[in-house]
Amino acid sequence: MSKEKIIGIDLGTTNSVVSVMEGGDPVVIQNSEGARTTPSIVAFTAKGETLIGQFAKNQAITNAVNTIRSAKRFIGRRLNECESEMKHVSYKVIRSGNEGVKFETSAGEFTPQEISARVLMKMKQTAEDYLGQKVTKAVITVPAYFNDEQRQATKDAGRIAGLEVERIINEPTAAALAYGFDKKNVNSKIAVYDLGGGTFDISILELADGVFEVKSTNGDTHLGGDDFDMAIMEWMISEFKNQTGIDISADKNTVQRLKEAAEKAKIELSGTMSTQINLPFITADASGPKHLDMTLTRAKFDQLTKSLVDRTRIPCENALRDAGLKASDINEVILVGGSIRIPAVQELVKQVFGKEPNKSVNPDEVVAIGAAIQGGVLAGEVSDVLLLDVTPLSLGIETLGGVMTKLIERNTTIPTKKSQVFSTAADNQSAVSIHVLQGEREMASANRTLGRFDLIGIPPAPRGVPQIEVTFDIDANGIVHVSAKDLGTGKEQKIRIESSSGLSEDEIQKMVKDAEAHAAADKAQREVIEAKNELDTLTYSLEKTVNEAGDKIGANEKQLATDEIKRAREAIESNDKARIESAKASISKIATDIASKVYSQSAPGAEQAAAGGPNGSAGSNDQGNSTNNGEKVVDADYTVVDDEKK
């Protein structure tokens, strides 16, 4: 068996992509539906089925409350941080634990990590089908501006999906890696502008002799293509209410129709100046059914979304400033993510950087390609490439007066480790509470709490005397580990930051087992579907043969075939694999017997045999060519066939 591959997965808000290194080059893998991108959508049906990807998307309008999309916008977040997202989804978002998030469906409650894991399992299966071998290792990408909790939650999703996450890397960095993979001898400074379905990132990198060094990163994890869709949706709802007096925002299935229509309109407006939005039978009142029929121009779309486009400007300017560069210093601007196709977005990029953006990369696939390259580096398949990423946000602890004291500044190259000595704030203090923070604000309360832990057993001493060394360690995944040590006694307390909105180890293990069980169930379901499809094909073929055979087969055989076709169709409806396989065997035998008879009737010499040959009489049959005492015997025309000359 060949060496195990490390696949690269772009786990996107809207779509996901999987890639792998083959023969020294990255290959984007098609899924079972023949597409290179897979919708990041999971649905639970009334029959108990779990649908992933395009199949889930296809039934979303009729099953809106059980179809989970854009789960990435909730991953690693607390419920009070998801208010804007919750307003615009068709499914129910509820509290998980103290502060976390879950999705409520007819099949049960699921965390964003579990939903993301289902998508990752689809990516894993896609890679395994392509490679013909089991896959257990992956590099998964995240938005550069994801905080520690979001990174940890993404890694947990990978574990639930049965993957060892070898590395979490930032999406813009992965894109730069893909862009510069064949340009190792080029020294340049590039900006990667990444506007995806749910997040926005801007990263400034320097490429030199195969070294990809991130100089700075910035972004907005509440901004993406979904927000552009929402702007169109809100306009449609408002316009329809003005026209009819009816509010169509309450019905979940209607909202799903509006969402899909808005997304379609957004895509069309990237290539045309106006688009027609037509949704028949959108609702009804006492006067009858109502239809939504509107024209949206690009000018109106630009007006509706101007504030969203403008929100990307300041992060770009901040990233340039943090990198110590001017816009004129940037050699190339790489566009990543589906939303960069919006003309107003491209125009803003041109204004900010003073140059036309580079459109040479596929914005939908480039991130997964970069992840595959990093997987190749970790697997030893790729050499002469070094990736130096950064932490997007500053890290520190709360100190006296509620101030945040930073230990690691944002845009510090990772992995990194830094220590600082603190002391007690009161006499005879026997314990210190370490409040770990992430953010850029001066006051602790204005930043994000990553976790808290206590160092106890400090010997009594006047305040300021004990020496407490706090160490922050950020690994290559951007995940934080913190320790506190009393230098006087040597006592130490270490933690890996686990957020209140995250998952415990027990919860992760339970979800891993659930996912494995679902994988087995999904495999069994797939086998049933394949068997049903095969039986359906056999049934159709037999029915066609019987209809075309005419009088070449007898009435008894026709009835036998008709009865078997009926039993086969009942088996198809049963979803019972054993019954389906039995029906396949029966119908195959009948089909073979009938086909043989039809063939023998149609074969050269069959007509001669039926007429009794040149010197004989026709055999008794329903045609009446021969009757009692040989009456009505007719001469048959025939041709002598010499088999030796055939």
UniProtKB/Swiss-Prot annotation:
NCBIfam families named among the record's database cross-references: PRK00290.1, PRK05183.1, prok_dnaK
Molecular function terms, GO-annotated: ATP binding; ATP hydrolysis activity; ATP-dependent protein folding chaperone; heat shock protein binding; protein folding chaperone; unfolded protein binding
Family per record: Belongs to the heat shock protein 70 family.
Source taxon at top rank: Bacteria
Region (Disordered): 598-646
CDD domains given in the database record: ASKHA_NBD_HSP70_DnaK-like
Induction description: By stress conditions e.g. heat shock.
Residues found modified as Phosphothreonine: T199
UniProt cross-references to SUPFAM superfamilies, sorted A to Z: Actin-like ATPase domain, Heat shock protein 70kD (HSP70), C-terminal subdomain, Heat shock protein 70kD (HSP70), peptide-binding domain
Alphabetized Pfam families for the sequence: HSP70
Keywords linked to the UniProt accession: ATP-binding, Chaperone, Nucleotide-binding, Phosphoprotein, Stress response
Stored InterPro entries: ATPase_NBD (IPR043129), Chaperone_DnaK (IPR012725), Heat_shock_70_CS (IPR018181), HSP70_C_sf (IPR029048), HSP70_peptide-bd_sf (IPR029047), Hsp_70_fam (IPR013126)
Keyword Isomerase among record annotations: no
Role summary: Acts as a chaperone.
Residue spans of biased composition, Low complexity class: 600-621
Organism encoding this protein: Leptospira interrogans serogroup Icterohaemorrhagiae serovar Lai (strain 56601)
GO biological process entries: chaperone cofactor-dependent protein refolding; protein refolding
UniProt name for this protein: Chaperone protein DnaK
